Each structure stands twice: as structure tokens, then as C-alpha cells.
Amino acid sequence: MKPIKKSITYGRHTLTIETGEIAKQAHGAVIVSMDDTVVLVTAVGDKKTKPGQDFFPLTVDYQEKFYSAGRIPGSFFKREGRPSEKETLTSRLIDRPIRPLFPDGFYNEVQVVAMVLSSDTEIDADIPAMIGTSAALILSGIPFDGPVGAARVGYINNEYILNPTTTQLKESQLNLVVAGTQKAVLMVESEADELSEDVMLGAVTYGHDQMQQVIDMINELADEAGVTAWDWQPAEQDLSLVEKVTQLAEADLRNAFRLKQKSARVEAINEIWQRVFTELKVGTEEGPSEQAVREIGFALEARIVRNSILDGESRIDGRGTRTVRPITIRHGVLPRTHGSALFTRGETQALAITTLGTARDEQKIDALQGDYSERFMLHYNMPPFATGETGRVGTPKRREIGHGRLAKRALLAVIPPVEEFGYSMRVVSEVTESNGSSSMASVCGGCLSLMDAGVPLKAHVAGIAMGLIKEGNRFAVLTDILGDEDHLGDMDFKVAGTEHGITALQMDIKIQGITKEIMQVALLQAKEGRLHILEIMKQSLPIARESISVHAPRIIKFKINPEKIRDVIGKGGAVIRALTEETGTTIDISDDGSVTIACVSSEGGEQARKRIEDITADVEVGRIYEGTVLKLLDFGAIVSVLPGKDGLLHISQIANERVENVADHLKEGQTVRVKVLEADEKGRLRLSMKAASISTEITADNPDNTEK
């Protein structure tokens, strides 16, 4: 295939897609450029399904190469290692809008690899990677109902901005990524500064309208390349088997889905399918395959649950479509942590813990754009016991990283600036029970644990997950969805925010045909649920605690002369090391002279502060100091008046009478009162005990005398 190149103006940038030159052995490969950001995206599919495969094995790997930004990795091996959080989140961002567009029953393995080859610090590579994935899949001929477009939307001065730069995003009230086909929105991921539902919906529709030119460009590219589609057809369904399975299971499944408790419902459904498998002799030469029966079973379960809701009956757990499950809240549940909260909503429960730290505890991130640190962290963990299962426990999976990032987005808008609250903060959400919307429970629990720790949040933040059931023109929006409703429904729509507006929104749609009106209904219904949860949270913990935990570090901040920093550090760090060890504190000094002391004991903190102030203080001529004799000389003594500030006390300045032997009047380690008589250009001090004694007498005789 000869090289083909297409370009358009996309926002302020030039977007270019090229194919036919690089990675020609991949089934589909494109180079996507947005100004100086360049991404290679490839798509490869296995033309045969593995025996017994009963799910769609799609893998998306997004990789950021350090050479793309002219950098060498900072690790010991000097090469890229395991995926960073940014790479994991972008891989999920690419995966979510394309996964629903592969046909049902397509179980062939597909792998998408997106490699960042050149990185412009002003243009994130995620949008080019999403566009490139769509183009590579279309060119590959793999069964795929695309193409998909993608856009980033900002909101500055009440105007939407298409594909804002990194600099623009710093002043934007919105950072929203939307992806969709020509007719439908499929995915939204955003964080916002308490924006209204109308502004958020407007951003989604604006982004969808703007991406149409990208979809047209991909179609033109595919037409010119002459794509050959795979010869793939879904397996024909055995209608007689469908009828048998329906007869054996439908009535019992309807009864099982009326059980409100998840564990009882799951057990009943498992028993039904075990009986059906036995009666149909699944897995034997006489019976059907397990995969065929499971596919029919999933469709049957979906039909039962969906029709029940659309027909106006109650949901699985007996609620109406707008009802939030019962909520209970406890805070301060753990005695030694800095802040904690237990948030329970129905059968979903999150134990959130907040830990306060110093600037030294901030997360250091080695990114393409350069090193930076984050003072607010949120980590989400969901062990297998949360769903009554066994499984691997250890490093977080992609899902856990994604859920943690969503909860973090929701809370970022209310975190106080460092000038108001100098601590770094880490929230960990331990999901101890899960039956739908554990990420939104993490938002609520995380907010409450921060307030329990004494973090002065701007407002309470609550999150809620919405669902959708749609058949033809009939649809129902569900508030606070269960796990089964998420699994069997058409949309997972998570909204978090304050009483004033939305701070985070995530939408994943499994079908095409979700209209603007449906999204509007979902947003307004989500607001109703969010305000209900916020009211309960406020009743439990109206404001943040006025004081932090006794187990949290105290922070003391002040400034010193930047030229004196080296005096505090000392040779080889000896002075500051001794300070931290002797006072039990942690001390950080910035280049501008800002000093931060973290301590558990306030006495230790004040002691460290005084010693630093003494080290950095300038000796004043004419002032009297309490000094320490460091060394005796034949002609006097060396006396320290401040840390690192020593002077000569001449023998003639020790006493009013003549002194023959210095040792008769002084000894090393003795504390003496001395007055600074002179400081020369090199900082050498001349001291006097006689003058100090005279000044003291004058002050005693005349209290109005203010001599130093």
C-alpha cells in the first residue's frame, strides 16, 4: 500500500493521520500527529478464536517513550519500566469507547498498541492516541462498528475551548474528554470546578459535534486505502436450545431476581444454572457447549431484569428508579489514623483513611513533561472478599487505578491551596463490600475522612452512579445502580460534585442511540440523588474538625534569609541532620528561604525553630548575648554568642580589674554575658564582659534606659 496522508485543522492544532510507511506488517497502523506530538498506533487481531474462548480478549497498551520528550529515564536501568499511572489511565481511556463497537460473539484476540514517539509539552498524547486507535482498527478490517472520534473540551470565560493546551487547562474550569461515533456519544471522562449540569452537557455535545470532522477524515483515509474486511460471521444461534433454556430457567430466574440480598440472589441463580447444566447434559457429547448455554443465559437474565424495570415494576432490590439505598456513616472509626470514615450505602461499603504529611511526602512523578509532585493522593483498593470471592491480592489492577483516579478528580476541586493548608494528603479507600458504585462510595468516604482529619475542604462532595435501560423508544434512568443493573444495563454514568455543581463526571455507554434528552434526564436525576446524599453527609459531619489529630505532624512555617540556608544545612548536612535528630522533627528548606518544620511534639518544633532563627540571626553590635566559652587562650577566650557566630573575648575585657590568668575567671563550657563591641568586614567579633556588666548596672539603676 502506498503511503497516504490526511490533515485537518482541529482546534488550534493541525491533526495529521498517515498510513502505509511504518509498521506495515500490523493489520492496521497509523502515525497520528497533533502539531509536534506524534503517536504510532497499531491494531492486530487473531483470525482464529481460541478453543473454549467465551469472552472478548481486547488489550490496549499505551506507552510513553522518554525519548519522545528528549529525556533519558531516571531509573537504574535507564529504560522504560512498568506502566505509569498515566499510561494505565490512558490505556483505559482508549479501551472504553471502542470495546462496545466490536460485535457480540466476536471472541478473537485483538491488541492495540499506541506508542508516543514525539511529545509536545503543550499537547497531551491521549487524544491523538484515541483517534489513531480508531483509524488503525478501521484500516485493519477487524469487525468494528467505527470509526470513533475524540476531543478534549475546556471551559474558559464562559466559552468552550476545543483541545486546549496544557497551559490553557491551568486556567480552565473544565477538563473533559469525549469520544463517540458519528451518531452517538460513547464515553466521557472529566473533572470540573463545580460546573452546572447544563454546562457539562453542553461540553459533551460541543465535543461530539467537533469530532465529526475527525470521523470524516478517517472514513476518507479508509476509502483511499481500500480496506478489506474480515470474513467473519457470528455463530448461528440454536433456537431450539434457546427455547429449552428459557423453559428450564425463566420462571426460577424471575423469582431469584426478587431476592433483595445480593449473596442470596447470587446463590439462587448459581443453583438454577447448575440444575439447567445438569438437565441439558452440558459438556457431554450429547449436550450443548457451556459457552452456548451461558450466552443464552446472560441474554435471558438481561431480558428479565430490563423488561421488569421498563414495565414499571420495582428494581431487583425493591426500589423505585429514583431511590437511593439506605446510607449509614461513621467517622473517627480508627484510633491512630489522622482521619477515617466508614461510608455504607446498601451493600456497598468503603472505609476511607486520610494521612497527613509534609512536602517531603508528596508524590514525585517522573513524566514526559518533566518531574513534578502532587500533594493530594487518593488510592482505591478492592480486595476479592468485597464481592464474596477469592482472588489475587497485591498490586493494584487497571480498574483500581481508574476508580482511584475518578475519586481523586471528584475531590480535587475542594482541596484547600497549600497557602491555607500546608500538608500533603493521602486518602486510601478500602472497599470492604461492593454491590455497585464503589468508586462513588470512595468519593463520599474520602470527603468525610479528609474532614475528620481536619482538612478545611471548600465543600462536601458526594458521588452517585446512574444506569440506563433502553429498548426502542422506552427507557428508564436508574439512580444508585446495583452491580447487576450495571452489568445488564446500557450505561454506567457516574457524577460527583458539591451542592453548587459537578466536580467529576464519567460516562460509559454500551449502545448507540443515547440522545441528548436522555443524558439531560440522567444528569438532573443524578443531581437529585447527589443532593440527597450530601444532606446525610452534612448531618453526620457538618464541618471539618477544627484541630488535626494528635498523631498527625504539626507544621511550622517561617522564612529565613536565603543567603543563610547553607548555615542551616552545614557542611555535608551536619547541622540540619543534628537539628532533626535532637528535636525529633523533619525540616525542609526551599531555595527562597521558606522553612517548613514538621513535628509530632510542638515543643520539639518550637525548639527547632528557635535554633534555626539563632543560626540565621545577624549579630548586632552593641547587643548583649548569653554566650558559651568554647576555648581558653593565653590572651583571652573564644565565646559563641549564636550558633556558628564566635568572637574573641580579650583578656582585658574579662573584668574591671587586671586579669593575670584567664583560667582563674573562665572555664570551657561556662555561660557568660558578653556585649558585642565590634564586627569587622569579615564577620569577626570583638566581645566584652566588662561592657556587658556596666550595661546591666546602668539598666538596673535607670529602668528607662533601653540599651541593648
Swiss-Prot record:
An example Gene Ontology molecular-function term: polyribonucleotide nucleotidyltransferase activity
SMART domains, per the entry: KH (SM00322), S1 (SM00316)
Coiled coil location: none
Keywords: Cytoplasm, Magnesium, Metal-binding, Nucleotidyltransferase, RNA-binding, Transferase
Record EC number: 2.7.7.8
Location of the KH domain: 553-612
Chief localisation class: cytoplasm
One term under GO cellular component: cytosol
Enzyme class, spelled out: transferase
Localisation per UniProt entry: Cytoplasm
Biological process annotations from GO: mRNA catabolic process; RNA processing
HAMAP family associated with the record: PNPase (MF_01595)
The protein, known as: Polyribonucleotide nucleotidyltransferase
Source organism of the structure: Nitrosomonas europaea (strain ATCC 19718 / CIP 103999 / KCTC 2705 / NBRC 14298)
Taxon lineage: Bacteria, Pseudomonadati, Pseudomonadota, Betaproteobacteria, Nitrosomonadales
Gene name for this UniProt entry: pnp
